[in-house]
Amino acid sequence: MRLPIFLDTDPGIDDAVAIAAAIFAPELDLQLMTTVAGNVSVEKTTRNALQLLHFWNAEIPLAQGAAVPLVRAPRDAVSVHGESGMAGYDFVEHNRKPLGIPAFLAIRDALMRAPEPVTLVAIGPLTNIALLLSQCPECKPYIRRLVIMGGSAGRGNCTPNAEFNIAADPEAAACVFRSGIEIVMCGLDVTNQAILTPDYLATLPELNRTGKMLHALFSHYRSGSMQSGLRMHDLCAIAWLVRPELFTLKPCFVAVETQGEFTSGTTVVDIDGCLGKPANVKVALDLDVKGFQQWVAEVLALAS
């Protein structure tokens, strides 16, 4: 039986690979997509998500979400993903539009209609998820679990200790981590290991139309990384759903720092139980890299 999931995303180049896997992995049933400001503005992430859905002829409803963090000024990753977030490939024009309600309400409505609890997957800042949990607490029993790409037990990627998705809206992340729902955190500890090799990347144009599109996106903004390998950060959240045996998880207490001058956005992961607090997150700490690479090749081969 396929696992029903809702995907909250901010595409973004590596988001495109994660979306492909969510659509084409035969084990998954992607029922709803929502967008959030993150890598680029929410208007651009929505446009990019709709372009991808049209490219794959996927009839999946999409709702536009939060344009700004809960309390602080927006930050983006334009330096990584470019001004549009997904330049480098000429997508066909289309007439698709997002749903007419905010993302968190679309998630609420879909959860309440679902015949069984649904797994939420968040691969951008957690603003929409925090709004859902704070404004619609009655939805919690209908959430099977939340799987996120975000955070780190060690080094960061936008500050010395903070990972971008958490640092983009620390207050939202703190709200989510305090919520009591089951959380699986695929942070930089594993995503920095999730590398597609230059040899595999070179085969993408001959794989299928998805391979050609992804190769064009990668080459446009990450041409240097094409020679050393590309980290598939967001894809790890999807991979865990399908191939959890590839990941080593440890239950830990995790809090999000929201006050520190230099540490805001840091996920404080109490690996050794120093704080004496009960675990609230299953933290992915290691990855079977070869198994991950094999799975990626298998699922992208299906993304015709």
From Swiss-Prot:
Q: Identify the PANTHER family for this entry.
A: INOSINE-URIDINE PREFERRING NUCLEOSIDE HYDROLASE (PTHR12304), NON-SPECIFIC RIBONUCLEOSIDE HYDROLASE RIHC (PTHR12304:SF15)
Q: What is this protein called?
A: Non-specific ribonucleoside hydrolase RihC
This protein's species is Escherichia coli O139:H28 (strain E24377A / ETEC)
Top-down, what is the taxonomic lineage of the species of origin? Answer: Bacteria, Pseudomonadati, Pseudomonadota, Gammaproteobacteria, Enterobacterales
Which SUPFAM superfamilies does the record match to this protein?
Nucleoside hydrolase
Give the positions the UniProt entry annotates as the active site.
233
For biological process, the GO terms are: purine nucleobase metabolic process; purine nucleoside catabolic process; pyrimidine nucleobase metabolic process
One annotated Gene Ontology cellular component of this protein: cytosol
Q: Which PROSITE patterns does the record match to this protein?
A: IUNH
Role played = Hydrolyzes both purine and pyrimidine ribonucleosides with a broad-substrate specificity.
Q: Which Gene3D superfamilies match?
A: Ribonucleoside hydrolase-like (3.90.245.10)
Q: Which gene encodes it?
A: rihC
